[in-house]
Amino acid sequence: MLTEAQVVALEKAKTEKEAHGEFESEHHPGYCGAQDTFYVGNLKRVGRVYQQTFIDTDAKLACTKLYDRKTPITAADLLNDRVIPFYESHDVKLLRILTDRGSEYCGNPERHEYELYLAVEDIDHSRTKTKSPQTNGICERFHKTVLNEFYRIAFRKKVYRSIDEL
């Protein structure tokens, strides 16, 4: 039996979880995807390169795409170009996306391109707590692996002149 203080503490914790977009994870592909932006580097003759990353948190499927800027349009483009078509080809509905609170993901829902795209596709948007990158740890770990296993090796072997070449 719970005391009154314990019930109040549980209700407060539940309210706090909802306020920060935390949720109990179901276990099926499409229930939740994590999306993040990774700064690859500044390449000569190319400029800044950013990688948009999407990972299905259950299936561990990753989709990435490189861009020369980090904007709401590029964040939505990854979903529109790679993620949603993949899920549709397998008759799976993407239900929720977890992102950080970066400007490419968060803004006025009536004018922000990424927020508008999620609304059109009927995808719920959860956000991590401020200054808590570990909340989206699946993307953080993936970025570290890609950096060590691909980018550092690729950049030692060749000079890339375009994002498409990379």
Predicted regions and their residues:
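RNase H-like two-metal-ion nuclease catalytic core shared by retroviral integrases
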Residues: 99-101, 105, 111-118, 125-149, ...
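Short small-residue beta-strand/loop micro-motif enriched in glycine and branched aliphatics
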Residues: 61-65, 126-128, 152-154
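Buried hydrophobic side chains on well-structured beta-strands
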Residues: 60, 97-100
